C-alpha cells in the first residue's frame, strides 16, 4: 500500500510549506512556498546562517530592502534546485496597503530571479489579499508576473482575486479553525468540527466549488494546516501547501485517501455569481469578523518577522 502522501498526490498537487530547502527533497513536492516567518526560522538555524551572511556580505552597501530581496531570492533559487515546479516568494508585508510599492517590489524580486536564470513561470509573488494587494496583483499579472494571494480568510477576498485574474490564492485553513475554536470557547466540539465540518476546510471547499462552477482559472491552494485530517478533507483541491511535519505524518501512514472535492458536484452546486468593487469588498470584509481580525493579525505578524530579518542582516 502506498503512503497517504503518495495517494494524496493522485488528487492534488502537493506543495512544501517551508524555507528549509534541505528538508524538501524527502517529500518530492512539485512546488514550495515561503513567507517571512519561514525564512526567519530557516536563517536562525546554524545550517543556513552562512547563506544569510554570504548574501549580505556580497551586497553590502546596497539599501537594506534590496539585500532582503537578495536573501529571499537566494532561498528561492535553492528551493528551485530541489522542486521541479514553482516557488512562492513574499513581498514585504509592510507594503500590504500600498499597491504601487507592492508592484515595484514584486518587479524587483522577479528581475533578481531572472538574473539568476529562473523563468517567470517558476516564481509566484506572494502578496497579502488586501484590496490594495489584489489591485497590485492584477497589474502584475497583466505584465506576466504571476501572484499568490495570501492571508486569505474571506469569500470576498477569493472572489475579488478570481475577478482580477490572479494566478493562485492561499486560503488559510488552520487560522480560520483557530479563530472559530477560540470564539466558541467551552462550547467548541472538536469531533463535530473535524474533517469536512472544519470551518477552515468548509471555507476552502466553498471557494474551490465556486471557482469550478464559474470557470475561474485561479488556482486554489489550501494552506495553514493544523492536522492531517484537514488536509485529507481537501483531497482534490488544486494544490495544498503542507509543513514538513505534516508531510512526514502523511508519508508515515498507509491509510486510504479518498477524493473529497468532486468537480461534478461543484458544477451543480447552488452558488450564485458575485462581483466586488472596492466599496463592496471593504464592506463584505468588515462584516466578516474572523477574516478582518485574521488578516490584520497576519499582516502584523509577518511585518514583525520582516523587521527581525532586517535586524539580523544589519547585525552582520
UniProtKB/Swiss-Prot annotation:
CDD domains in alphabetical order: Transaldolase_TalAB
Compartments where found: Cytoplasm
InterPro entries from the UniProt entry: Aldolase_TIM (IPR013785), TAL/FSA (IPR001585), Transaldolase_1 (IPR004730), Transaldolase_AS (IPR018225)
Record: active site: 126 (schiff-base intermediate with substrate)
EC number: 2.2.1.2
Entry's Gene Ontology cellular component terms: cytoplasm
Enzyme class: transferase
GO BP annotations listed: carbohydrate metabolic process; pentose-phosphate shunt
Keywords: Cytoplasm, Pentose shunt, Schiff base, Transferase
Entry-linked Pfam families: TAL_FSA
Pathway: Carbohydrate degradation; pentose phosphate pathway; D-glyceraldehyde 3-phosphate and beta-D-fructose 6-phosphate from D-ribose 5-phosphate and D-xylulose 5-phosphate (non-oxidative stage): step 2/3
Disulfide bonds: none
Catalytic reaction(s) noted: D-sedoheptulose 7-phosphate + D-glyceraldehyde 3-phosphate = D-erythrose 4-phosphate + beta-D-fructose 6-phosphate
PROSITE patterns: TRANSALDOLASE_1 (PS01054), TRANSALDOLASE_2 (PS00958)
Gene Ontology MF term list: transaldolase activity
Protein family per UniProt: Belongs to the transaldolase family. Type 1 subfamily.
HAMAP family: Transaldolase_1
Chain's role: Transaldolase is important for the balance of metabolites in the pentose-phosphate pathway.
PANTHER family (alphabetical): TRANSALDOLASE
Subunit structure, interactors included: Homodimer.
Protein name: Transaldolase
Taxonomic source organism: Methylibium petroleiphilum (strain ATCC BAA-1232 / LMG 22953 / PM1)
Amino acid at each position: 500500500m502506498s503512503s497517504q502522501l503518495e495517494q494524496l498526490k493522485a488528487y492534488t498537487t502537493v506543495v512544501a510549506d517551508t524555507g528549509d530547502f534541505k528538508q524538501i527533497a524527502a517529500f518530492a513536492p512539485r512546488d514550495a512556498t515561503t513567507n517571512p516567518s519561514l525564512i526567519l526560522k530557516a536563517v536562525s538555524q546554524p545550517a543556513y546562517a552562512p547563506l544569510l551572511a554570504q548574501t549580505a556580505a556580497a551586497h553590502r552597501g546596497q539599501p537594506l530592502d534590496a539585500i532582503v530581496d537578495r536573501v529571499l531570492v537566494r532561498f528561492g533559487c535553492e528551493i528551485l534546485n530541489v522542486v521541479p515546479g514553482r516557488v512562492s516568494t513574499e513581498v514585504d508585508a509592510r507594503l500590504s496597503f500600498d499597491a504601487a510599492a507592492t508592484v515595484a517590489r514584486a518587479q524587483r524580486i522577479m528581475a533578481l530571479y531572472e538574473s539568476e536564470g529562473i523563468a517567470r513561470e517558476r516564481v509566484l509573488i506572494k502578496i497579502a489579499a488586501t484590496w490594495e494587494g489584489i489591485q497590485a496583483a492584477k497589474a502584475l499579472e497583466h505584465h506576466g508576473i504571476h501572484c499568490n494571494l495570501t492571508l486569505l480568510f474571506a469569500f470576498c477576498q477569493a472572489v475579488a482575486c478570481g475577478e482580477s485574474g490572479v494566478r493562485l490564492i492561499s486560503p488559510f485553513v488552520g487560522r480560520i479553525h483557530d479563530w472559530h475554536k477560540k470564539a466558541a470557547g467551552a462550547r467548541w466540539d472538536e469531533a463535530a468540527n473535524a474533517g469536512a465540518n472544519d470551518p477552515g476546510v468548509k471555507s476552502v471547499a466553498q471557494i474551490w466549488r465556486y471557482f469550478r462552477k464559474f470557470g475561474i482559472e485561479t488556482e486554489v491552494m489550501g494552506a495553514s494546516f493544523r492536522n492531517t485530517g484537514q488536509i485529507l478533507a481537501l483531497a482534490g483541491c488544486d494544490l495544498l501547501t503542507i509543513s514538513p511535519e505534516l508531510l512526514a505524518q502523511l508519508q508515515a501512514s498507509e491509510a486510504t485517501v479518498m477524493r473529497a472535492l468532486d468537480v461534478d458536484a461543484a458544477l451543480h452546486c447552488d452558488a450564485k455569481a458575485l462581483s466586488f468593487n472596492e466599496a463592496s469588498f471593504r464592506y463584505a470584509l468588515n462584516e466578516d469578523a474572523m477574516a478582518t481580525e485574521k488578516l490584520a493579525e497576519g499582516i502584523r505578524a509577518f511585518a514583525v518577522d520582516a523587521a527581525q530579518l532586517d535586524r539580523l542582516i544589519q547585525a552582520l
